[in-house]
């Protein structure tokens, strides 16, 4: 079996799945206190890196995703599957877990 090299461009989400690059979490508080990894909040904002073809409807047609590559989005805190690629954090989630497009 050949080894597969995973990069953002080789990840092709299926159905209504969206692949998001997670924004970096805050390293310190507003008062200047450095936060250890265990105290950092899980980020809920990221940039859309890849978009699936859309949800398949009962009649066989596809529902076009409402987000596009490059959109900044706010998503549910515990949604999706966390993935690490090339030192960056990503999350693969269903479009229904995206709450809003921001910025």
Swiss-Prot record:
Gene3D superfamilies: GroES chaperonin
Keyword Cytoplasm included in the entry's annotation: yes
A Pfam family: Cpn10
One of the record's GO cellular component terms: cytoplasm
GO biological process annotation, one example: chaperone cofactor-dependent protein refolding
Cell compartment(s), UniProt: Cytoplasm
GO molecular function: ATP binding; metal ion binding; protein folding chaperone; protein-folding chaperone binding; unfolded protein binding
Principal location listed in the UniProt entry: cytoplasm
InterPro entries on file: Chaperonin_GroES, Chaperonin_GroES_sf, Chaprnonin_Cpn10_CS, GroES-like_sf
Keyword NADP appears in the UniProt entry: no
Keywords for the protein's UniProt record, in alphabetical order: Chaperone, Cytoplasm
Source species, domain of life: Bacteria
Cited function: Together with the chaperonin GroEL, plays an essential role in assisting protein folding. The GroEL-GroES system forms a nano-cage that allows encapsulation of the non-native substrate proteins and provides a physical environment optimized to promote and accelerate protein folding. GroES binds to the apical surface of the GroEL ring, thereby capping the opening of the GroEL channel.
HAMAP family: CH10
Quaternary structure note: Heptamer of 7 subunits arranged in a ring. Interacts with the chaperonin GroEL.
UniProt family annotation: Belongs to the GroES chaperonin family.
Protein name stated in the entry: Co-chaperonin GroES
Chain's gene name: groES
